[in-house]
Structure formats: structure tokens, C-alpha cells
């Protein structure tokens, strides 16, 4: 078990930058959900950044990332988006789901191996009904790359995070982006079929 780490602090400039990224992330998610065939083109354009050792080196990233499946996982994701994915409706931002995403992010900032008590957190800012999904992505800084990574789900043959992004029953979402002591950055996305914000969510979001 990893020792708990103090939460990373951000200044006002970073906070504004992170909010911008969160907005961009939701935009990317909705592009993916509503037009998967077009999103496949983004992944195709990025496939060229693999070397012959399964290392992904994007020119805008500080360092390369060694992957488990290499470009083959990109090919599989492209095929899925072009030939199998069914477009689903865009997600609407929820204040309560946003707060929930930040609570989860805060737990992972303190302990990367944290066992999140979702049952305890889910009712903190509102009332849930129907489907619920939560996905995390460690390390990436650029919104497009974050969503590509979730779609590709390198090393996870179940592609569970991809399935979560395409959950047809989801209607609302929350997005949190922040620093991480080990992986530099962390993204948490929460989605629900129906979520009714409580007063606390409206006051604190």
C-alpha cells in the first residue's frame, strides 16, 4: 500500500488553467460519444508517434510513454469507433457530479491505492438514479490525449473505461483535473443517468 501523500496545492492561475482543461475534456467526451467515426480520425493521426518499441512519443509531451500493446491497441480502438461504436447523446455538466469527481481525485492525490467508498460519496451532493460510471486517467496533461488513452485502454483487454464513456444510459457528467505527486496529473470523470443536486452541491460547486 502506498503511503498517503499531501494534497497538491494550486494557485489561481493553475486553477483557471485546470478549469479550462475540464471544460475541454467534457467537449472531447461529447465529440467521442456523438460522432465516434470522426473521433477515430484523431486516433489515426496520433498513431504515428509510436516507435518500434511500443513507446509513444507525442511532440507536445515532456517524455515518451511505454505502452503494453503499442500501436495495435490504437488500431483496435480505430476499428471499434469506425465499425462498432453506436453514437449516443452528449453529456450535460452536473455540479454535484463535479464535486464527486473532485472528492475522488482528492482521495487519489493522497493515496494512489485508495479504496474509494463510492457508496458513501455518491449521496453526498445529490440523489442518484440509474446507471453510474467513474473513470480515472493518470499522467496525461492534454485533454485530447486523456480521452484517447481512455478509449484505447492500453493493457486492459476488457476496454472497460471505453465502455464507460459510451454508456448510453448516462445523461450527466462531472470532470475533475488536478496534480498528482507520482503521476504528475490525474483526471476523474463521473457520469450518471440521473442526478438531482442537493443544496450543498449548488452552494459548494
Where are these regions (language model features)?
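A short alpha-helix/helix-coil micro-patch that ends at or immediately precedes a cysteine
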Residues: 10-111
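Short, well-ordered helical secondary-structure segments
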Residues: 5, 16, 61, 68, ...
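Low-complexity, Pro/Thr/Ser/Gly/Ala-rich linker/spacer regions in secreted
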Residues: 16, 196-204
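Short, flexible segments with low predicted structural confidence
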Residues: 4-5, 72-73, 136-137
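A well-ordered secondary-structure block
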Residues: 94-198
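Acidic, proline-/serine-/threonine-rich low-complexity intrinsically disordered repeat tracts
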Residues: 1-12, 204
Amino acid at each position: 500500500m502506498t503511503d498517503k501523500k499531501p494534497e497538491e496545492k494550486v494557485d489561481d492561475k493553475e486553477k483557471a488553467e485546470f478549469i479550462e482543461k475540464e471544460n475541454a475534456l467534457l467537449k472531447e467526451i461529447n465529440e467521442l460519444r456523438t460522432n465516434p467515426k470522426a473521433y477515430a480520425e484523431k486516433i489515426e493521426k496520433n498513431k504515428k508517434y509510436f516507435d518500434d518499441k511500443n513507446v509513444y512519443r507525442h511532440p507536445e509531451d515532456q517524455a515518451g510513454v511505454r505502452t503494453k500493446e503499442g500501436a495495435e491497441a490504437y488500431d483496435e480502438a480505430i476499428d471499434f469507433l469506425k465499425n462498432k461504436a453506436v453514437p449516443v447523446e452528449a453529456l450535460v455538466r452536473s455540479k454535484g457530479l463535479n464535486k464527486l469527481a473532485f472528492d475522488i481525485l482528492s482521495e487519489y492525490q493522497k493515496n494512489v491505492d485508495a479504496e474509494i467508498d463510492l457508496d458513501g460519496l455518491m449521496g453526498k451532493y445529490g440523489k442518484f438514479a440509474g446507471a453510474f460510471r467513474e473513470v480515472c486517467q493518470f499522467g496525461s496533461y492534454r485533454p485530447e490525449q486523456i480521452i484517447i488513452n481512455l478509449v484505447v485502454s492500453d493493457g486492459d483487454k476488457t476496454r472497460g473505461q471505453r465502455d464507460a464513456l459510451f454508456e448510453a444510459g448516462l445523461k450527466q457528467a462531472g470532470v475533475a483535473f488536478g496534480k498528482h505527486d507520482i503521476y504528475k496529473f490525474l483526471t476523474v470523470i463521473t457520469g450518471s443517468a440521473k442526478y438531482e443536486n442537493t443544496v450543498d452541491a449548488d452552494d459548494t460547486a
